[in-house]
From Swiss-Prot:
<dbReference type="InterPro" id="IPR002099">
    <property type="entry name" value="MutL/Mlh/PMS"/>
</dbReference>
<dbReference type="Pfam" id="PF01119">
    <property type="entry name" value="DNA_mis_repair"/>
</dbReference>
<dbReference type="InterPro" id="IPR038973">
    <property type="entry name" value="MutL/Mlh/Pms-like"/>
</dbReference>
<dbReference type="Pfam" id="PF08676">
    <property type="entry name" value="MutL_C"/>
</dbReference>
<comment type="function">
    <text>This protein is involved in the repair of mismatches in DNA. It is required for dam-dependent methyl-directed DNA mismatch repair. May act as a 'molecular matchmaker', a protein that promotes the formation of a stable complex between two or more DNA-binding proteins in an ATP-dependent manner without itself being part of a final effector complex.</text>
</comment>
<dbReference type="InterPro" id="IPR020568">
    <property type="entry name" value="Ribosomal_Su5_D2-typ_SF"/>
</dbReference>
<dbReference type="GO" id="GO:0032300">
    <property type="term" value="C:mismatch repair complex"/>
</dbReference>
<dbReference type="GO" id="GO:0140664">
    <property type="term" value="F:ATP-dependent DNA damage sensor activity"/>
</dbReference>
<dbReference type="GO" id="GO:0006298">
    <property type="term" value="P:mismatch repair"/>
</dbReference>
<protein>
    <recommendedName>
        <fullName>DNA mismatch repair protein MutL</fullName>
    </recommendedName>
</protein>
<dbReference type="InterPro" id="IPR014721">
    <property type="entry name" value="Ribsml_uS5_D2-typ_fold_subgr"/>
</dbReference>
<dbReference type="InterPro" id="IPR036890">
    <property type="entry name" value="HATPase_C_sf"/>
</dbReference>
<dbReference type="InterPro" id="IPR013507">
    <property type="entry name" value="DNA_mismatch_S5_2-like"/>
</dbReference>
<dbReference type="GO" id="GO:0016887">
    <property type="term" value="F:ATP hydrolysis activity"/>
</dbReference>
<dbReference type="InterPro" id="IPR014762">
    <property type="entry name" value="DNA_mismatch_repair_CS"/>
</dbReference>
<dbReference type="InterPro" id="IPR042120">
    <property type="entry name" value="MutL_C_dimsub"/>
</dbReference>
<dbReference type="InterPro" id="IPR042121">
    <property type="entry name" value="MutL_C_regsub"/>
</dbReference>
Amino acid sequence: MSHIIELPEMLANQIAAGEVIERPASVVKELVENAIDAGSSQIIIEIEEAGLKKVQITDNGHGIAHDEVELALRRHATSKIKNQADLFRIRTLGFRGEALPSIASVSVLTLLTAVDGASHGTKLVARGGEVEEVIPATSPVGTKVCVEDLFFNTPARLKYMKSQQAELSHIIDIVNRLGLAHPEISFSLISDGKEMTRTAGTGQLRQAIAGIYGLVSAKKMIEIENSDLDFEISGFVSLPELTRANRNYISLFINGRYIKNFLLNRAILDGFGSKLMVGRFPLAVIHIHIDPYLADVNVHPTKQEVRISKEKELMTLVSEAIANSLKEQTLIPDALENLAKSTVRNREKVDQTILPLKENTLYYEKTEPSRPSQTEVADYQVELTDEGQDLTLFAKETLDRLTKPAKLHFAERKPANYDQLDHPELDLASIDKAYDKLEREEASSFPELEFFGQMHGTYLFAQGRDGLYIIDQHAAQERVKYEEYRESIGNVDQSQQQLLVPYIFEFPADDALRLKERMPLLEEVGVFLAEYGENQFILREHPIWMAEEEIESGIYEMCDMLLLTKEVSIKKYRAELAIMMSCKRSIKANHRIDDHSARQLLYQLSQCDNPYNCPHGRPVLVHFTKSDMEKMFRRIQENHTSLRELGKY
């Protein structure tokens, strides 16, 4: 029979560490939150080997008094709350008194601190939760905490750590969120001697956004605000033209604390209404100030889950704040920004229905019709507008570095026309099966068709020897382009075209790290991005199958797909990419095409291995036989009974 015993404090701390300290990013979060609670205006985070070897946090806060340093490593010892009433009005990020002892129990911890007016500072060294020394030391006002050999005494936890790049990505995400939560604090993240993130700490949220997400993104975000007796909402959301493929760029803060809340995320999307494209999500940084009595943060040790009173009222306020701000904006994308790019393109884009065509051939020839080619060369220069004059020196220096040395395209994320897509959603879960099926397709006979009309700018009508054919023009071109892309994607040899003016692509630091890990997948499909500055990549050549006007949107789409796909084979990646690009690059519904283009499309469809289904499996064309038509018009009776026999005469 086992007996009930009280666990030793060190063992209890290690158990608590299992909930509080999941990975190096947890250490960074807890220590930085302590620094924020200490009133710091500058916080420096230094890490080595993604935090597994070393995490060091230096702040200029209040510090810890000499006689309280050792007490800080005891469980549930805190300066944040004093009594039960304080627990229901928490105004600090920390309050449990678990973080520091939990960290100390699974690492070698060195703490150096001093308070204002003290004759000396204090140095504490603890190993595995056991304090080894506490001695006077020289230190500036503030605290420096150094955590080394994390999880050295819990090897099971080490076993489940991901790659260094993945762990570093989590740390960058934590620091970015804290920087957005507290724009009044200067944050600097240094990994293995290289600065990854820096915010100015001026108190201006737009500047913090520019330092983290980039200058271009910051300029495309609009301010929101709303309030009632219980809540005060402020922040920035992106214009509908600036979106991402997932919700990771939505940051919600309650009283300076980053939280995750599904209902508030839903309220943000509701605020955009139908202005957002299908499957796309905005960038949002929203601060909610609330009476602490209405928010319960004592739910989970990580404190990311918060229970909110009057949550429905808050959701309404958030939605209204976004909707009202969007009403004040001109949501047509700024044509002036892309004027240089689109001058040639706009001049050449003429409604095809007015072209003088002399096409008298009833049936298409068995040689591919000539297709007109367009060359589009455009220069794009980034300019600092008046709105951007107050941005951080860091952001300006980055911009100068991009524009001065050479003439470059600074790529922007362009929204795809998801609202016009006939198939806006891709079921990526079925890609493997679909790809295997598509690869097994063999060339099949296709009837000779005579095109004679179009309906609603969507369906083509053609007749063959055995009846009427109705063709979905989007599905038809999607099938044609899919087979083109399927053959060309990945054909790297002799398929590159040099760019006269290279393109620069910018990503947040955590996305840039993950892209570096998965860059070989891009190279397999002929896209070669080279590092260029902080969190930026340069493209000097592009696959021959990618039109120059599609470079910006195409590369960003490929990178978004790559970031969303954690484990992907080359085969699956190429299939996803071919399906995605064929869908987005095909003519849409309600788009009239001339007779020549229609005949050309039918010819291209006839050359496909499988002309009967689009890559999603939907039918490309339907067939009515002559007999079917006669039955519909009652020209023949199915049982061949005469009208006289039916008694009609």
